[in-house]
């Protein structure tokens, strides 16, 4: 299995997006391509058809490659629970929650074997692999036990492209420093450089390309432009940004998302990028909230902690005032759990303290108990109270808590198997659910937004076909990258590497 690995001079230089583009480019050229990232650190998950959990970025890259995502594409996923600990997900299933020191000391050998197994499995079904690195390959304090960069390139025996972000400044120093800190055998793997996020006429950087090639001895395979029009999901919180409407504020739907410290699966909001009259802003204080057209209370990796923060900041009282004065709220997963009267950490799975309790926001008649085993599943269901033409919905669930309705209430959804989910209160102005990707359902999203539009005196808009838009985004990204990247030269380098290794 031939391949290429994309490494970067730092985090958030564009590795994920470039890997996504390469997956699409190579797939369009007839290759059977798989993405791969040995170890991902993110609270944004992708649930495979088997109900197993991988990093969202590799799920997106699999879609770009026109392949079904599998756990072998991301064998290790680390999900931060606080500043010191992270949950380890190995081959799609949670296995432990440990500190960084304990992880390095106790998990390295197991992680190495998982990576070898994943690469071997993928090689049986694919003829090309596009591997994404993490952070920088020259974190010298970590490199004795690294599992994400040059060690993976060695295991897969593939050449490396080094990506640098010119937008943040210091592109020459970052490239020079990275190459200088690599070991000689590692530097030999670097067959090309990509300068990313360039603004303006690339001819203005021609002397920069010459300097890099003359002084560093590595060819520049492309100078990629800044691509603000490409709507591909970011990997993690480093890429989290606001969604800006193309219309004036008084003609737009203003949605405020409560910016939780351990916010997870914020990709639930991605569909709004394709709605031209929707603006999304992340809000971390009551003063900044204002009077939005809707509030979204998203998921979190640390429900108790983030709920306590919301209460300390005065959001409990503010949300009560907002809901009782005709405001609209949608709460997803951890946000849904927060809506209730009380949360009980029976197993200590959220707080580490068995039996810990906390009062909720008291907006819905529900109570949540946290168990030991996490539920991860793709879900299908029906809306019991349709918005517009919406009826059937799909999504996925990732949660430790189980939520019970403790007073008469109206569930929002009926899942396959005749199980109910969520709450539907105040004639649909307050919805809580465990369904991630609720807004990926075109009819639901359209019906919900049109309700907000009518309420604001705006005209209704036709349904945006999300899947069609996403496919077009992958092709647009591939077109933009293929226009400036020397793809044929890259393929030649990959072929030659395979022949000589």
From Swiss-Prot:
Location of the GATase cobBQ-type domain: 252-444
GO BP term, pick one: cobalamin biosynthetic process
Pathway membership: Cofactor biosynthesis; adenosylcobalamin biosynthesis
Active site, UniProt feature: 333 (nucleophile), 436
Pfam families: AAA_26 (PF13500), GATase_3 (PF07685)
Cell membrane is among the record's keywords: no
Domain of life where this protein originates: Bacteria
Any one GO molecular function term: ABC-type vitamin B12 transporter activity
UniProt entry keywords in alphabetical sequence: Cobalamin biosynthesis, Glutamine amidotransferase
SUPFAM superfamilies assigned to the protein according to its UniProt record, in alphabetical order: Class I glutamine amidotransferase-like (SSF52317), P-loop containing nucleoside triphosphate hydrolases (SSF52540)
Function: Catalyzes amidations at positions B, D, E, and G on adenosylcobyrinic A,C-diamide. NH(2) groups are provided by glutamine, and one molecule of ATP is hydrogenolyzed for each amidation.
Family statement: Belongs to the CobB/CobQ family. CobQ subfamily.
Protein name, entry field: Cobyric acid synthase
Organism: Halalkalibacterium halodurans (strain ATCC BAA-125 / DSM 18197 / FERM 7344 / JCM 9153 / C-125)
